[in-house]
Amino acid sequence: MRVVLLGPPGAGKGTQAQRLAEKLGIPQISTGELFRRNIEKDTKLGHEAKKYLDAGDLVPADLTNQLVDDRLNKSDTVDGFILDGYPRSLEQAKALHEMLERRGTDIDAVLEFRVSQAVVLERLKGRGRADDTDDVVINRMNIYRDETASLLEYYSSELKTIDAIGTMDEVFARALHALGK
């Protein structure tokens, strides 16, 4: 099963991605982890990504796409994967479709974890990170909303919306149900 997880910061995507990956026996693929791993291994792509990250810039889409494409070449993705944090734009979604089309497959499901701005603020404040101020979080939520509007339309036939308010177990059960598991 090939699954994309969408949701604003603080929606619990990372937690649910990890749990779903364990339950389904497929890898969780996070772009943040891909950046870190490639930087640690000092790969060519990691070296390129590091330049942007060190400057505080976003890693360009084409470089992120290359990192994801390389990761999808690994044998553990043959039976599926959970993508967490990718794609973030329509351009990346189309690139992902091309990557999978070359492999004779496509996305099976897209889960959007929905949560209110008030809940996100409460959750992120609980993390205790200095950059989780109300203004920063609201800005990140607005960016997410603006970026993903076109993604939700693009994935409309595979999209399932998950109520991400509740305990981790409740949200996990909803996600499994949405996947027919």
Swiss-Prot record:
Q: Which domain of life is it from?
A: Bacteria
Q: Where is this region: NMP?
A: 30-59
Gene Ontology MF annotations: adenylate kinase activity; ATP binding
| Pathway(s) annotated for this protein in UniProt | Purine metabolism; AMP biosynthesis via salvage pathway; AMP from ADP: step 1/1
Please name the Pfam families in this protein's record: ADK (PF00406)
The primary location reported for this protein is cytoplasm
- EC class (word): transferase
Positions of the UniProt region annotated as LID: 126-132
One GO biological process term? AMP salvage
- List keywords of the entry alphabetically: ATP-binding, Cytoplasm, Kinase, Nucleotide biosynthesis, Nucleotide-binding, Transferase
Q: Is Nucleotide-binding one of the keywords UniProt gives this record?
A: yes
Asked whether the keyword Transferase is assigned, the reply is: yes
Q: Where in the cell is it found?
A: Cytoplasm
Please list the residues that bind ATP.
Answer: 10-15, 127, 166
A GO CC term attached to the entry: cytoplasm
Q: Which reaction does it catalyse?
A: AMP + ATP = 2 ADP
InterPro entries listed in its UniProt record: Adenyl_kin_sub, Adenylat/UMP-CMP_kin, Adenylat_kinase_CS, P-loop_NTPase
Domain remark in the UniProt entry: Consists of three domains, a large central CORE domain and two small peripheral domains, NMPbind and LID, which undergo movements during catalysis. The LID domain closes over the site of phosphoryl transfer upon ATP binding. Assembling and dissambling the active center during each catalytic cycle provides an effective means to prevent ATP hydrolysis.
- What function does the entry list? Catalyzes the reversible transfer of the terminal phosphate group between ATP and AMP. Plays an important role in cellular energy homeostasis and in adenine nucleotide metabolism.
Report the sequence similarity comment from the record.
Belongs to the adenylate kinase family.
Which HAMAP family has this protein been placed in? Adenylate_kinase_Adk (MF_00235)
Subunit architecture: Monomer.
Protein name from the UniProt record:
Adenylate kinase
User: What species does this protein belong to?
Assistant: Mycobacterium leprae (strain TN)
Q: Which gene encodes it?
A: adk
